[in-house]
Structures are given as structure tokens and as C-alpha cells.
């Protein structure tokens, strides 16, 4: 089964050597998104709510580049620097879906790249 790396002009500039998205077998895999504004390259404030909104906006923009939306997400993995932010991130996350929600895993990662507070990766289906 062939893999493709689609164009994602709305994705923030990568912080490491990876593609923002990859597609195979009708599934689209988005690399973890952090609270980085793709237009300015600036990070969202050091507040988990602000960062979570930026993360979800980034996810929506990248999915939009691929002709997809939040309703196409089938699985998410949420990484938190601090599990005490679980409820705040849940509130933001839930506001982007009408339900039913995608399958999901949430873990405390301890430390995230560049001291971000939240990172979310998604799998979407065509």
C-alpha cells in the first residue's frame, strides 16, 4: 500500500525532521501539533487553554488543506506536560466536536518539545 506525503501549507514549520501529515489506505496521520502559530511562528502563551486552542486550530487548518475536517478524525492522542491540565484541555477539545467524539488516549508526557504544555496528534479517515 503506497504512502503519500500531502502538501500542508497551513501547518506550522516543523521543529524536527518530520512531515506534518502522511496518508495511506484512506487514513491521514497528522504529526503532533503544538501551540505554534503557523503565520507568525510564535508560540501561544504559556497557558494550557490558549495552547490547546492553537493546537486545535492547527489541526483544523491542516485537515482543511487535505479536504477534511474535525468530523473526519477517528483517533487522537493527547500528550500533556502536566496531567493536572486534563480538565482544561478536555473543555477546549470538546468545543471542536459535535459528537460522537473520536477514540482518544491522553497521557502525561512529562516534558514536551520546546516546553509546550499540550501536543495532539490525530488520525483521520477519508
What kind of region is each of these model predictions?
Residues 2-126:
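Short, polar/acidic, helix-capping and beta-turn segments at strand->helix junctions
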